[in-house]
Amino acid sequence: MLTFQQLILKLQSYWDAQGCALLQPIDLEVGAGTSHVHTFLRAIGPEPWRAAYVQPSRRPKDGRYGENPNRLQHYYQYQVVLKPAPENILDLYLGSLQALGLDLKQNDVRFVEDDWENPTLGAWGLGWEVWLNGMEVTQFTYFQQVGGLDCKPITGEITYGIERLAMYLQQVENVYDLVWTEWEEPGPNGPVKRRLTYGDVYHQNEVEQSTYNFEHADTAVLFRRFAEHEAEAKRLMGVREEGAADDGAAVPQLALPAYEQVLKAGHTFNLLDARGAISVTERAAYIGRIRNLSRLVAQAYYDSRERLGFPMCGTAAAPAATEAA
């Protein structure tokens, strides 16, 4: 049986062999691996990029107090980014399933058309859900736009739902029953097998974080935080707020620090949404505000790489960024 952590190690080994940089998760609260700086920003511009990493993902509204067998407010994705998307990307993905021990002839693997969109990031792509014997385990996307900029070349993204994949491989119906790891310890009558489950690691976290997300997150503090993160992102993009005093301190466009503020604003918005503190009309407006910040950051990042001559291309010549109408 493949344990939860062995599954991750096998994916790491497989994608390492395909030339991917094995990176670490971004150390901020994000709702998906796509929000990682090494997907969102690296998809912009002409420079090639191959990376893979585990990303803890938080979606406050999806919490169920640890009572739902397959729905979590905190879970893991395994993210693979290939730019430009290779022609054999589907074969590479199927090869990764075989590396996990899946016999493709004995299992029903289906690609179901499901185009992807992330409104807050100004991003969308053509793609598919991958269903393994009737369960969605992966999202497959060809990025068309990121931060409102056309992707040239197209980036291929593969996002594995690690818990769901592990549940199938271990043949369990409750995520908390997943075996995270197992080992043997010496005992008085011989070796004793021990195991650590997903529930041992995360069940209490699901209960308490759900309680916070739905009942105790301070909305007044969250509204203030959102405004602060938004203002800081704008300041780092050189956008002066109306009525703000001119202190004479010019800030260069700092795309990477500004993007961190965008991510913080996004998570704050998700908490407000979970608390029911934002109306349907306000929700659309907040999403628009975050999207506008994402577009500013995307253009600033592109411009900064262009000034450097797109060093990972090996040439200074590259097409101009094209913003969608």
Swiss-Prot record:
Main location: cytoplasm
Gene Ontology MF term list: ATP binding; glycine-tRNA ligase activity
GO cellular component, one term: cytosol
EC number: 6.1.1.14
Catalytic activity as recorded in UniProt: tRNA(Gly) + glycine + ATP = glycyl-tRNA(Gly) + AMP + diphosphate
Top EC class for this record: ligase
Cell location: Cytoplasm
Keywords associated with the record: Aminoacyl-tRNA synthetase, ATP-binding, Cytoplasm, Ligase, Nucleotide-binding, Protein biosynthesis
Pfam hit, one: tRNA-synt_2e
GO BP field: glycyl-tRNA aminoacylation
Source organism, top-level taxon: Bacteria
Description of how the protein assembles with itself and partners: Tetramer of two alpha and two beta subunits.
NCBIfam families: glyQ, PRK09348.1
Family statement: Belongs to the class-II aminoacyl-tRNA synthetase family.
Protein name: Glycine--tRNA ligase alpha subunit
